[in-house]
Amino acid sequence: MPAKKLVLIVVDGMTPAAFERAADGRAPALAFLAAHGEYRRGTSVFPSLTPVCLSSIATGVGPGAHHIPHLVWWHRGERRIVEYGSSFSALRAAGIAQSITDTVYNMNGAHLSAQATTVYEALEDEGLVAAAVNITCYRGRTRHLPTIPWVTKAAFGPKRFFYYGLFESDATGAPMAVRNRAGGSTDLYAAAVGRWLVTRDGFDFLAYYLSDFDYASHAYGPDLAEDVALARTDAAVQAIIDAAGGGDAFLERYAVVLASDHGQTRVERGARLETPLAPFADEIVVTASNRAGQVYLLPRARVDTAELAARLDDEPAVEVTLRIEGDEAVARREREELRFRPHFDGWQTSGDLSILDHPDALARSWSALENPNAGDLLVSAAEGWEFADLGGRHHAGGGSHGSLVTGDSEVPLLTIGVSGDIGRITEITPAVRAHFGARVVAADAV
């Protein structure tokens, strides 16, 4: 018997607490799904930033294997900053044309590891039809031309591919008002496309990405975001349920995985990570955004990562730094260090484990450090702090994410009709592939 078709719903930035309150009745569509599924709190990756997290969801591997390290990073080979959209000011600082190219094309076409198979590639290699709506990690086998006449460069996505109105594999009539992001325009667009797809039963697998909750959470904080954006999120979920003929008909037709990519915590203060490292400005490149930062050593650097980490000991915005020394990772916090490395029965450690007293912190830190595009020193922000981006912007007074702390790292995970105990966002794609019986090859296990 063929596997039931599957919808993956990703609500950007929704915390477990927000989902749990929604499931108590504040959001009818989410409450309906919660009543019919298995729910648990799961764990994101580090840095808990959208490009990194969505790449982990789409590939089923951590950043050490998929190679997307952050929202903003230093490209060692091309000797330039890559900026995926921390803010408009950051895009302008990095170069708008290059940043748009990096975000729309290069993240999938050049930066995402060719060895990390996406869920769309894996399923369509089995003869299934995959669809993606607005998700920024979209790499597939099908060539798509942009909808804008003067933009001619193609992107490769799944057979049914919808990307903020710029790429549309099918004419759906869905409106896309980029300038009304605060009014929920991206989720309205997703809902219109999702309704069109479900009405036609036009896929075997759908990645349905809803981003407006995160936008509201950055602006107002994770708690007030529920008042601003929860109804919009719920309406977008209700749209695809109604398109199937109602809740029972929807679940008769589709299995469901619902998750967030990361959590969100309240931010009260902003800091520039570059400031305490200013004496080494000609030896390093600092890239920071939200609640995670990176420091890259230039070839001429005389300073080492241990000295840089010690320099950050007294910075209130910094909770922990991470670096590699030999075959070990070193986490440093308030002059204390923890050394760790993978071992055949788990982890070999030396030092105070409380330095990384966060969800799945050893594995998440190791994967981040293994990323060939990551900085030589990684920095996780302290509670209540955020690092200003290239344009000097931060979300003080609102919400943010990116660090190792629990609030940034925990996500809601709900499954309906999908086997397996999914506890991490990296386990979503393996579960989806298993659901459809898609084979796994050696390269997928990196």
Regions found by a protein language model. Name each.
Residues 61-220, 339-355, 374, 388, ...:
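His/Asp/Glu-rich, glycine-adjacent segments
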Residues 219-234:
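Active-site-proximal segments of metal-dependent phosphoesterases and phosphodiesterases across multiple
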Residues 10, 41-42, 129-135, 205-209, ...:
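A structural signal for short, well-ordered beta-strand segments and their strand-loop junctions
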Residues 20-72, 131:
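Short, structured active-site-proximal loop/turn typified by the sulfatase FGly-forming signature C/S-X-P-X-R
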Residues 7-8, 29, 232-273, 378, ...:
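Metal-dependent active-site segment of extracytoplasmic phospho-/sulfohydrolases and closely related
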Residues 2-6:
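Extreme N-terminal starter segment of soluble prokaryotic enzymes
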Residues 13, 260-264, 383:
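Active-site metal-binding loops of divalent metal-dependent hydrolases
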Residues 115-116, 286-429:
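Active-site neighborhoods of enzymes that stabilize oxyanions during catalysis
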